[in-house]
A protein has these predicted regions:
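Core alpha/beta nucleotide-donor-binding catalytic domains of modification enzymes
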Residues: 1-154
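Short helix-capping/linker segments at secondary-structure and domain boundaries
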Residues: 2-3, 160-165, 222-230
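AMP-forming adenylation/ATP pyrophosphatase catalytic core
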Residues: 8-12, 42-44, 58, 105-109, ...
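Generic solvent-exposed, charged/amphipathic alpha-helical segments
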Residues: 27, 64, 156, 219-223, ...
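Short, structured helix-loop boundary elements
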Residues: 48, 52, 167, 232-235
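Internal, active-site/partner-interface "lid" segment
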Residues: 141-149, 167-178
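Conserved anion/nucleotide-ligand pocket segment
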Residues: 152-154, 158-170
Length: 281
């Protein structure tokens, strides 16, 4: 590695029983390679599935706070991609969700690169063994009470036994749906541009769209503003309150994500315009 002076290994210490051992292993490994090492402590009050979401949010907030134009390299592999796509399908998702983990993404003013997304976990473990590189594994990854672990330990191995090319096929699926979603969003962005005024989206313009197209326009508009996007039931409430109520009604709807990965949003009607306000409690 030529740019070791600019390369920093960032470790997240989740302050559980094995955290100190994990941090020591990573620090020693980086010292051997002359790589700068930093550790950030993350303390989470909740447990279970809530812990995973809260920890993910704190990690992303730390990555956002890094110096502008940082390039963040993460180690997600193709087995992680299978897990993510299946998990999203089970929870209910659309094109964007099925497109999975992106190879390149933005977090704040920084860029995330995931160069191993097409590599299998098996290939990575084989490389580590061949090169005699020691590694540690989080014992909580074996706890199948976590939904993702259940998929990883119980479901995905059985799928692989039946369909040996699942890694390549899911990778192909995510690339296709990513391109399809990009085309779809390009169409919706043109609609948003037509409907925009200085405050938000015009109610009359939105009413000219059919119900599904209207809901997709509103979702993408909010997504572009980096706020919480409504789920199916919240979208039905928006439809009823803003587009099926009396013209003189002035509805206000407030919603947020339970994992707080994005700020909450308040939707209201002001002067025949659908207006969005952010809130973060």
């Amino acid at each position: 590695i030529e740019l070791t002076s600019k390369l920093i290994a960032l470790h997240f210490n989740h302050e559980n029983k094995q955290s100190s051992a994990f941090e020591s292993h990573c620090r020693d490994f980086c010292n051997e390679l002359n790589i700068n090492f930093e550790s950030q402590n993350i303390k989470i009050a909740v447990s279970g599935e809530g812990f995973e979401a809260a920890a993910r949010l704190k990690r992303m907030n730390i990555l956002k706070s890094l110096p502008e134009n940082s390039l963040i390299i993460q180690g997600h592999h193709s087995d992680d991609q299978i897990e993510t796509v299946l998990f999203r399908i089970i929870r209910g998702t659309g094109l964007k969700g099925i497109s999975g983990i992106p190879r390149v993404a933005k977090v704040g003013e920084n860029k995330i690169l995931r160069p191993f997304l097409k590599e299998t976990k098996e290939n990575i473990l084989e490389f580590l063994s061949k090169n005699k590189i020691n590694f540690v594994e989080d014992h909580t990854n074996n706890d199948i009470s976590y939904s993702r672990n259940f998929l990883r330990k119980e479901i995905i191995p059985r799928i692989k036994d039946k369909w040996h090319s699942i890694n390549e096929n899911v990778s192909k699926l995510t690339e296709i749906t990513k391109d399809q979603n990009s085309l779809y969003e390009h169409y919706l962005k043109d609609k948003i541009d037509d409907l925009k005024d200085d405050a938000g989206l015009t109610i009359e313009g939105l009413k000219k769209l059919d119900t599904f197209e209207r809901s997709e326009v509103i979702r993408l508009w909010l997504d572009m503003e980096l706020v919480t996007t409504p789920n199916h039931s919240q979208m039905k409430e928006i439809e009823k309150s803003f587009f099926q109520s009396r013209q003189d009604a002035n509805p206000v709807i407030k919603f947020e994500r339970s994992d707080r990965q994005r700020v909450g949003v308040i939707l209201k009607k002001i002067n025949k315009t659908l207006v969005m306000e952010k809130f973060d409690e």
